[in-house]
Amino acid sequence: MIFDDLKNISFYKGIHPNLDKAIDYLYEHRKDSFDLGKYEIDGDKVFLVVQENVLNKEENDRFEHHKNYADLHLLVEGHEYSSYGSRIKDEAVAFYEASDIGFVHCHEQYPLLLGYHNFAVFFPGEPHQPNGYAGMEDKVRKYLFKILID
């Protein structure tokens, strides 16, 4: 898991070629305004999903995880808590291979406050819980890069 200031994102180039593609795309298009939807960067290896999400104000003990894709979360409007889960307790919802998503319960969680100035990357196998209410806005606009880690 990576949580850092956006100005430092280039430090993470070299971890994986597909992560490099996402970082390069972000630099090339950082001043662009995207409509909601999916944008292919390198087919199914790297793509961007622009979302507007209503934040979850309820307590939630389920963490999503992926086997094949890393998620790079970057908010362009608003603030949210995106929690990192540690020490998986049990499976909450069976893994769905076609969508590369499953849900687990964790013994520990670490909330990360995301805003326009920072980002988080959750690698395959790392439980995370995006879209948590941060006590400010009720919804956020975010860029979610899906990055195949093979």
Task: Put a short name on every predicted segment.
Residues N68-A70, L74-E80, I88-K89, Y96-I101:
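Glycine- and acidic-residue-biased ligand/ion/polar-headgroup-sensing regions
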Residues G43, N60-D71, I88-V93, H107, ...:
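A short beta-loop-beta micro-motif enriched in histidine and acidic residues
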Residues H79-S82, P127:
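Short beta-strand segments in beta-sandwich/barrel cores
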Residues I2-V49, K57-N60, H65:
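A short, N-terminal "cap"/entry segment at the start of jelly-roll beta-barrel domains
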Residues F119-V121, E137-D150:
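A short hydrophobic beta-strand segment most commonly corresponding to one strand
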Residues L113-G132:
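Conserved metal-binding segment of the jelly-roll/cupin
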Residues Q51-K67, Y96-Q109, P127-Q129:
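Short acidic (Asp/Glu) patches
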